[in-house]
């Protein structure tokens, strides 16, 4: 069984119209994509469902109904780079214009994870004796698809 190491993973943003359903399409897409550089953290990809539980007077039991999916968000941090015209710039632009982007994650085993995202937060953090950090919150806006072939 092969495991995927997170160190070395690359994160790219492209227009939602860019084809990314095969490894070849993903490789072509990231060749001209905006890469998020100096990424320190990335949150969890996935979602949860609302659960409704019904109980009955006539039985000591209950049933559960699974609601629709609510996708999560990923708080990301990277070293601030004012000259970064790629990743940090596109995160700021997507935040400002409220636009959706397609994120292509190149995993270290050569596979890809693809999902649509929006940006709900964009900020910088200044701490004593630390690098300036650029922070964004990436909102997952579609199911994540694993591209393995």
List the predicted regions and their residue ranges.
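Short, charged, solvent-exposed linker or helix-capping segments at domain edges/interfaces
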Residues: 87-89, 146-149
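Solvent-exposed edge beta-strands and adjacent loop segments
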Residues: 1-77, 120-132
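Short linear sequence elements within intrinsically disordered, low-complexity coil regions
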Residues: 8, 17, 47, 85, ...
